[in-house]
Amino acid sequence: MVAKASLDEARYNNQASFLKLLEESVAAMQGIPGVQSAAVGLTVPYERALNYSVKVADGRQAGEQDITNLVYVTPAYFEALQIPLREGRSLTVGDRSTSQYVAVVNQAFARKYLGRENSVGRHLLSDGSTIEVVGISANVIAPSGFTQGGPIAAEPTVYVPAAQMPTQLVNLAHVWFQPSWIIRTKGKFAGIAQQMQQALGGVDPDLPISGVYGMTDLLSDALLLQHIEASLLATLSALALLLSSVGIYGLVSNLVNQRTRELGIRMALGCTLQGAMFEVSRAGIAATGAGLAGGLLLSSAAVKIVRSQLFGVALYDPLTLCAVSAFLALVAVVAAVLPTFRIAKIDPAETLRAQ
């Protein structure tokens, strides 16, 4: 469960009051019966994070400065959200403002900036401070913090201890974001949302709590626009498939009809019925095959466009490509074969007399 509250208030504009609230509220959350772990984070998975400029001090792209997702967290954040650590350690209560600045980065960040091996122990530079990478976490999906639109994805993300977050940056983040109080329970408990609100209210009765949500609710909200876009795209795709089928049927049928008279003459001169049917069908099916080949080549470019807008679209989907190609090929075969039955009714003598 996730509770959200605004900290965009003057009384939390200094580090001492901010950290005191986090520590006391997390302790209150942990006191709720059935709670396994509790933590606070600026954002949670599926949400847009703060965009922040970070320079890589060493690694594959040493010296490069880029904007990435930044999330401040308290200890147990990864445990509460069940985000596995792939390397190194998590952030702990020992990571204070007076200790070495540290961070956990996700696999997407490590792969892009630090290289695939020995990422733990590398260093980042931010606001004149050197930050040591102490852990690599698994990726979670989220919108990019510095783009509008596009699908949620595994964006490069840096997680830093809330105690080491610069106060000015914390205050700026609270203008745009409502921090999240996260708990993980041993099972489903009735009234857990009310207990979370009571725990926060016990620490600060004036804390403006905007709501309590399940992670499934946050995921649904994050994917709402994606669902609308996917439904619209599916409808348009079905319409395009229908129009393609009608077009292929009409084109192939027309090609066959145009050659009916010619084939009647060929039959009068000794061509067999089977040979005439093959001759008239071949051109239409060949034209369809050429069109399918061109469509398959263009599909790779179309997939890249769709992937830039929708989450979870596979780069290669041979099953769908084969199914659509087979359907259109079947339409072409039917369109080519049906008119050929007229050939069987052609009287070669009548055709010669007409000529």
Each predicted region: which residue ranges?
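Short coil/turn motifs that cap or connect alpha-helices
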Residues: 84-86, 90, 259, 272, ...
